[in-house]
Amino acid sequence: MSKATKRKHVVKEVLGDYVQPTEHQSIVKVLGSPGNNLHEVETAEGERFLASMPTKFRKNIWIKRGDFLIVDPIVEGEKVKAEIAFILYKDHQRLLQKEGLWPEGFTQDKTGLVAKEKESSGIQSTEAQAKPQGEDSETDDDSGLFVNTNHVHYEDSEEESESEEDEEN
């Protein structure tokens, strides 16, 4: 099987299948990747350990911090205590939550994050209401714009622009 065909089948399997964890499997959250196809994960109870990525996923599927996985336990492992069985994307997570198979420890994290986001957006909305309506400070503020570091940045001062206007008149 060629690499492209293998990648196609692996991606189709990961994105298309809806898998429920068995009694031995558990759902974990990725905390980081120390390297060598190992990922530091945390269970809903707060236990941290390393999980290895099987060869079928390597260089085909990418896992980032904050993703959720279904892992198979490795009994004889001291540091590496699990092997990744399945990667859970948003659709998979919603389905498991609807079926009641989602761990309580992870649902509390999500509701906590949502509450924090609402609080921060509430603060921003009150700040927007506190500004006078006549000021157009949003148009003058360029701090939110992307800065291209590949181009030389020239500083324009008001004095130079005023003197250029005087010379033109």
From Swiss-Prot:
> What cellular component terms from Gene Ontology apply here?
nucleus
Tell me the compartments it is located in. Answer: Nucleus
* Key words of the record: Nucleus, RNA-binding
Respond yes or no to whether keyword Mitochondrion is given for this record: no
Bias kind Acidic residues: ranges: 156-169
Give this protein's Gene Ontology molecular function annotations. RNA binding; translation initiation factor activity
Cross-referenced InterPro entries, in alphabetical order? EIF1AD, NA-bd_OB-fold, RNA-binding_domain_S1_IF1, TIF_eIF-1A
This chain belongs to the protein called Probable RNA-binding protein EIF1AD
Primary gene name: eif1ad
